[in-house]
A protein has these predicted regions:
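Thiol/disulfide oxidoreductase modules built on the thioredoxin-like
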Residues: 217, 224-270
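Conserved helix-turn-beta segment immediately C-terminal to the redox Cys motif
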Residues: 177-199, 269-272
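A non-transmembrane, solvent-exposed segment enriched in polar/low-complexity residues
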Residues: 1-80
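N-terminal "domain-start" segment that seeds a small globular fold
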Residues: 122-155, 219-220, 266-268, 272
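Conserved redox-active cysteine motifs that mediate thiol-disulfide chemistry
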Residues: 159-160, 167-184
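Thiol-based oxidoreductase modules, predominantly thioredoxin-like and allied folds used
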Residues: 192-206, 217-228
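N-terminal targeting signals for export/organelle localization
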Residues: 38-40, 49-51, 57, 68-139
């Protein structure tokens, strides 16, 4: 760098998001690299980032805050810029699990075929494929995880019972707030061919076990202690917790993300 300026040259296979950082920055500034001349300016601290000469960055930086605003329509963005990788990125990164599956698929279908090789689109397609397998009416995919004693337990072991798969973690405040409600549901229905399997996204065994004890969670608990790197949340399309699924005795998903009073109402209807 000389007098606050530098240049670099190269090519990329396709536009992707990269980080640009200085020693003064706590976190890299994000921008897309594409095969066009670009002029980038920002402070040493990473503030006031601007990029000239890049249509992808025009869309990316121009919507960096808008995507979080109430009323933002990702469908409108994709419809207007179907061949822009930044639109595909925003759909994948922020709306994959916010949109109902049918709406997600409809918006995905509006992306230009030229973006099919984008890793954002490929990851989005993989997520859609997983979500299609865990919709209401589908048989929940089997899995095995260690319990609190380190013994491998499979979902198939519970076939014949109504099962609530409860995704949570000891570090998750909303999960901990919901736990008393789940405890109440368990105590009221545990003698009605109903049980709960807690699947934790913890990565610390001691904190996991302490959370179970502190919240009086007396049902089966499983975790590979891999945090979000666990394969099971991905298998079930879980990207935020708390999350749950209610399975019938045949392992068919009959309800999803039922919390607070909705949990009790659903169980009363199903277990009557």
């Amino acid at each position: 760098m000389k007098e606050g300026k530098f240049t670099f040259e190269g090519t990329v296979e396709q536009p992707l998001l990269y980080g640009l950082a200085t020693e003064e920055m706590d976190w890299p500034a994000q921008l897309f690299l594409e095969n066009v001349p670009m002029e980038v300016s920002m402070t040493k601290e990473g503030e006031s980032l601007s990029v000239k000469g890049s249509a992808v960055n025009d869309l990316f930086l121009g919507n960096a805050e808008k995507v979080f605003a109430p009323g933002f329509s990702i469908d409108s963005l994709v419809s207007q810029y179907p061949d822009n990788p930044a639109a595909a990125f925003y759909l994948y990164r922020y709306f994959t699990y916010q949109l109902p599956l049918d709406q997600l698929k409809a918006t995905r279908a509006k992306l230009a075929p030229a973006l099919a090789s984008s890793p954002y689109v490929q990851d989005l397609d993989a997520i859609i494929a997983r979500l299609e397998k865990v919709q209401i009416g589908q048989v929940a995919p089997d899995f095995s995880l260690p319990d609190t004693a380190g013994v491998s337990v499979s979902l198939a072991d519970f076939r014949g019972k109504y099962v609530l798969l409860d995704f949570w973690a000891s570090w998750c405040p909303p999960c901990r707030r919901e736990n008393p409600n789940v405890v109440k549901a368990y105590e009221e229905n545990k003698d009605k061919n109903f049980t709960i399997i807690g699947i934790s996204l913890d990565n610390n065994r001691e904190k996991w076990l302490k959370g179970i004890a502190d919240d009086h969670l007396t049902w089966t608990h499983l975790s590979d202690l891999k945090y979000w790197d666990s394969e099971i949340p991905a298998l079930y399309g879980v990207r935020a917790i708390p999350s749950n699924m209610l399975l019938d005795p045949n392992g068919v998903i009959i309800a999803k993300d039922i919390r607070e009073e909705a949990l009790h109402e659903t169980l009363r209807e199903v277990l009557k």
